[in-house]
Amino acid sequence: MTATILVEKQKVDRPPLELHYLGDKVLRQPAKRIAKVDDSIRKLAKEMLQTMYSANGIGLAAPQVGINKQLLVVDCEQDKPDEPPLIMINPQITRTSEELCVVEEGCLSVPNVYMDVTRPRAIEVTYKDEHGRPQKRLFAELTARVIQHEMDHLNGVMFVDRVDNPLALAESLKKEGFSMQAVKPVA
């Protein structure tokens, strides 16, 4: 089942939500599960999509717009207007591939910083859709990577925490006005 929230895949003059950036405490708090999927959650998902498209992103988690809820949106097919975005509520990764891949990542909350990150190539995810219906799907390649990246945000983890090259990361962060002190390396 795919999303039925209709949002034009284009920038809006005034994005409805404000992005938060590396160093903001809201990005480090574990997000709370959503108890009930209702119109307020669907409205939030729609506003997150509008904000994501306006920032030229392909994924966005609620903590990135200052909202401590387990909600993320993903759209790796923005050039296909008929392909609906993914809306995931309370997502959980239930399986990962043994095969890992290293790909350069960026983040709307750390603008202009791009670094290599190692992640599983494929994942299985359970989640609720925007109607509260349980879903279980397999994802691979770019979509799997974006989902993992956004799910990290739901746990207070950012992609810079997963970078294996601290010297290059420090240089890149400094160039963009961010501090290495905001990075919390994960094992």
From Swiss-Prot:
Gene encoding it?
def
What is the source species? Synechocystis sp. (strain ATCC 27184 / PCC 6803 / Kazusa)
Cofactors (names): Fe(2+)
Q: Name one GO biological process term.
A: translation
Which SUPFAM superfamilies does the annotation name? Peptide deformylase (SSF56420)
From the Swiss-Prot or TrEMBL record, give the protein name.
Peptide deformylase
Highest rank taxon of the organism: Bacteria
User: What family is this protein classified in?
Assistant: Belongs to the polypeptide deformylase family.
Q: List ligand-binding residues for Fe cation.
A: 107, 149, 153
Q: Which HAMAP family match?
A: Pep_deformylase
Q: Pfam families of this UniProt entry?
A: Pep_deformylase
InterPro entries in UniProt: Peptide_deformylase, Peptide_deformylase_sf
What's this protein's function? Removes the formyl group from the N-terminal Met of newly synthesized proteins. Requires at least a dipeptide for an efficient rate of reaction. N-terminal L-methionine is a prerequisite for activity but the enzyme has broad specificity at other positions.
Q: Give the co-factor note.
A: Binds 1 Fe(2+) ion.
What chemistry does it catalyse, as a reaction equation?
Answer: N-terminal N-formyl-L-methionyl-[peptide] + H2O = N-terminal L-methionyl-[peptide] + formate
Query: Gene3D superfamilies from the entry?
Result: Peptide deformylase (3.90.45.10)
Q: Which CDD domains match?
A: Pep_deformylase
Question: Which Enzyme Commission numbers does its entry carry?
Answer: 3.5.1.88
Q: Which UniProt keywords apply?
A: Hydrolase, Iron, Metal-binding, Protein biosynthesis
* Positions annotated as active site in the UniProt record: 150
Broad class of enzyme this protein falls into: hydrolase
GO function term, MF aspect, one: metal ion binding
